[in-house]
């Protein structure tokens, strides 16, 4: 069954709602240019209220290594997701398992993937204006090719309306959604979250 990550969590209410709906992982954005940015202190409070067996992922963009590792410790992150141009060496120095994100323009966007030895690879649509959360899709055929590198997490413009088609096309390890289940940036819509997870898991 496809794993589901709900990203851009900013409140304990949204976190618990997503878990109740069946989310496997929650994502917290530690990037001050994102409308879903959350400070480590607040994220730690939310994470401290979660039940067991939920994976907690921290998303970082071009952050200093010390900040990444300190935040991972403070917030008890299970996984660090690096969404910028972080090097293979940088990834190896993170003290958590790493998901490396790649923003896809075309098939050449995959050229750097085999440099990395990480736990998973997240594929998102390229935007010159933002690192994720754009609501833009990309050619899913590219994601099919990328599966040769390891576990693929499909992101970029996923919604309750297209997630079934996306999974049928790619058969990814997991899917990642943020803006596609929101009523406003950083505010999750319970009905959309429930429907997305239901369709992603074929329930």
From Swiss-Prot:
Coiled-coil region: none
Enzyme Commission number(s): 5.3.1.24
Involved pathway(s): Amino-acid biosynthesis; L-tryptophan biosynthesis; L-tryptophan from chorismate: step 3/5
Keywords: Amino-acid biosynthesis, Aromatic amino acid biosynthesis, Isomerase, Tryptophan biosynthesis
Catalyses which reaction(s): N-(5-phospho-beta-D-ribosyl)anthranilate = 1-(2-carboxyphenylamino)-1-deoxy-D-ribulose 5-phosphate
Keyword Amino-acid biosynthesis included in the entry's annotation: yes
InterPro entries: Aldolase_TIM, PRAI_dom, RibuloseP-bd_barrel, TrpF_fam
Biological processes per GO annotation: L-tryptophan biosynthetic process
Any matching Pfam family: PRAI
Annotated GO MF terms: phosphoribosylanthranilate isomerase activity
CDD domains membership: PRAI (cd00405)
Gene3D superfamilies: Aldolase class I
Annotated family: Belongs to the TrpF family.
NCBIfam families: PRK01222.1-4
UniProt-recorded name of the protein: N-(5'-phosphoribosyl)anthranilate isomerase
Organism: Geotalea uraniireducens (strain Rf4)
Gene behind the chain: trpF
